[in-house]
């Protein structure tokens, strides 16, 4: 287990335990996804929280003013605890680990889907059903991303299994077939 994961696990596990005891795990998972997205998309926020110039109290006040209206007290307490312990810089690792533990607990399979263009809601629903069938599960969490280099189609990653239904993948396979002939 990498060091960052080792450091993140106790915080993630504690958040999951709090969520389970209060029957808020599902809501906390949704908050974690939204917070992870906000954290990932704001380099300024990351820089400010990692800055040694900003005091711990300053970081906690900033977190409070930024998130107190949009997240639960349990999640806000986690943010403040990470700030207190000088670990706010690893927020993304803690949230990702929390989501892993949550999915494990709920039996949810994570699928990474990369498509050539953004998928409509209807396409996402169809894809979700197909992924459930392939994964042999009733619950799936899909992490969508867009890569125009795929030319067309999509690539699905389920653990170590990769399903390449992209035009780029088909062209590559054709090239390999021709090279062997």
From Swiss-Prot:
It holds the Pfam family OSCP. Gene3D superfamilies: N-terminal domain of the delta subunit of the F1F0-ATP synthase (1.10.520.20). One of its GO terms (molecular function) is proton-transporting ATP synthase activity, rotational mechanism. Its main location: membrane. Keywords: ATP synthesis, CF(1), Hydrogen ion transport, Ion transport, Membrane, Thylakoid, Transport. It is a peripheral membrane protein. It is found in: Cellular thylakoid membrane. GO terms for cellular component: plasma membrane-derived thylakoid membrane; proton-transporting ATP synthase complex. Signal peptide: none annotated. PROSITE patterns: ATPASE_DELTA. PANTHER family: ATP SYNTHASE DELTA CHAIN. HAMAP family: ATP_synth_delta_bact. Belongs to the ATPase delta chain family. F(1)F(0) ATP synthase produces ATP from ADP in the presence of a proton or sodium gradient. F-type ATPases consist of two structural domains, F(1) containing the extramembraneous catalytic core and F(0) containing the membrane proton channel, linked together by a central stalk and a peripheral stalk. During catalysis, ATP synthesis in the catalytic domain of F(1) is coupled via a rotary mechanism of the central stalk subunits to proton translocation. F-type ATPases have 2 components, F(1) - the catalytic core - and F(0) - the membrane proton channel. F(1) has five subunits: alpha(3), beta(3), gamma(1), delta(1), epsilon(1). CF(0) has four main subunits: a(1), b(1), b'(1) and c(10-14). The alpha and beta chains form an alternating ring which encloses part of the gamma chain. F(1) is attached to F(0) by a central stalk formed by the gamma and epsilon chains, while a peripheral stalk is formed by the delta, b and b' chains. This is ATP synthase subunit delta. The lineage of its organism: Bacteria, Bacillati, Cyanobacteriota, Cyanophyceae, Synechococcales. The gene is atpH.
